[in-house]
Structure formats: structure tokens, C-alpha cells
Amino acid sequence: MEIIPAIDLQNGEAVRLYKGDYDKKTVYSKNPLEIAQKFEQMEAKYLHLVDLDGAKLGQTRNLEIVRKIKDQTNLKIEIGGGIRNLDTVSLYLEQIGVERVILGTAAAEKPDFLKELLVKYGLSRIVVGVDIREGFVSTSGWLEKTTLPYLSFLKDLEKIGVKTVIVTDISKDGTLTGPNFELYDEISKETSLDVIVSGGVKDSSDIQRAADSDFYGIIVGKAYYEGKINLEKEFNHANKKNYPLS
């Protein structure tokens, strides 16, 4: 299992939202590149980036920061937020060279487009972000709740050929109250998808719980920024246990 640190980008800054609310924002740094470099020094392998402006508006607004992080670190980058057409996917994967892109809204609204990307780029480079609010999938930066029950949607993704999903319980995100492990356990039981846990991580016990359940990965954001988790210690422990993320 891989521990994946997160940087959420808005207006060129590193921020965190509370339960996906754009009006409840905390700014942690005006220099996201410095944070990424610090993660690299801690021996992180992957970095989870979210373009919050992109997620809300459907346009890439933090492109140059993503490019700088890719050029000035050796971190393997996954990026999500506003990736809704082939040009944007191509920009990230082919021009900037990130390792994988995360589709959310596009995956829910355009399954044929998702299939096209899986064929063109392969299963390892296309990840689907499944954001859940009150049992249903949410889109457009968590602002729109669909009528798609999350488990049905996940099973549809599996049929299409998706391999990896990042699942977020929006009610947990940014709360430091612990992930909704019942949700993740259910998904693992009902599908064969590789599940990355996202939202609500509060301390190292959550990382251990995810590892014990053999989840594919866990994303850590606010718990690090608020000093609740010593990521350097966690990376060292994970590297010794040899949890690879292919």
C-alpha cells in the first residue's frame, strides 16, 4: 500500500477545504512547489494533486504549478480536477508527463470517453475519482449530486475496464474524524477494483487500518498540514515494509 500526500491547488496556493465547501478554505502555503519538495525529501514516491479551480470551472487553472512540480521533483504525480476532454488529458500525460490523471465528472457523464482513454493510455494511467455524498456520486468539484448510487457506478466502472479508483466520502473530507472504512470495506467486497482511500484521515492508526485491509493506497492531506501525522516516519515504515504502488 502506498501513502500518497496531497496538495489541493486553488489560485496558485496550497489549500484544504472542509467537506468540499469552497467557502470553508484554509490556505496552508503560497508555494506548493516547496511542499512537494518537502514530501520528496521525506521519501514520498507519489503526489496527489487536485486543481480545485479546474474541478469547479472545468478548466485547468493551475497548470504552471503542476508543470513546475513535475520538472523540479522526481515525484510520480497523479492529477485531478477539471479533466473533461482529450486535450486536457493529453496535456497532462503527454506534454507535462504526469504519471496518471484522475477523471471524476467526465467518468460519470461520458462513459464512452472514459473507455476511449483506457484504450489510448492504458489502465495504469487513467484513474477514476468517485466522490460520494449521501450515497450518491457527486460531480463538478463536489457541487452537483447525481442520481447515481455509488455502488452501481463502481460496478459499471469495473465492467468498462477501470482498474483503480480513488473514493472520497465528502462528509469526511477535511474533518480529521477518520475515513469511512465501512464504505471502503463494502467496495472491496463487492468489486475487484483497486481502492485508494481518501477523506478524513486523522492519524497514523488510519494508515495502519488501510494497510491491514490491503487497500491499494491512502491519501493524506489535512492530517499532515495540521501536524497530526509524521509523514516522514510513515514513509520510512512503509518503505521498509515494501508496499509498492505500480
Swiss-Prot record:
It is found in: Cytoplasm. It catalyses: 1-(5-phospho-beta-D-ribosyl)-5-[(5-phospho-beta-D-ribosylamino)methylideneamino]imidazole-4-carboxamide = 5-[(5-phospho-1-deoxy-D-ribulos-1-ylimino)methylamino]-1-(5-phospho-beta-D-ribosyl)imidazole-4-carboxamide. GO terms for molecular function: 1-(5-phosphoribosyl)-5-[(5-phosphoribosylamino)methylideneamino]imidazole-4-carboxamide isomerase activity. GO terms for cellular component: cytoplasm. Disulfide bonds: none annotated. The active site is at D8, D131. Pathway: Amino-acid biosynthesis; L-histidine biosynthesis; L-histidine from 5-phospho-alpha-D-ribose 1-diphosphate: step 4/9. Its EC number is 5.3.1.16. Keywords: Amino-acid biosynthesis, Cytoplasm, Histidine biosynthesis, Isomerase. One of its GO terms (biological process) is L-tryptophan biosynthetic process. InterPro entries: Aldolase_TIM, His_biosynth, HisA_bact_arch, Isoase_HisA-like, Isoase_HisA-like_bact, RibuloseP-bd_barrel. Belongs to the HisA/HisF family. PANTHER family: 1-(5-PHOSPHORIBOSYL)-5-[(5-PHOSPHORIBOSYLAMINO)METHYLIDENEAMINO] IMIDAZOLE-4-CARBOXAMIDE ISOMERASE. This is 1-(5-phosphoribosyl)-5-[(5-phosphoribosylamino)methylideneamino] imidazole-4-carboxamide isomerase. It comes from Lactococcus lactis subsp. cremoris (strain MG1363).
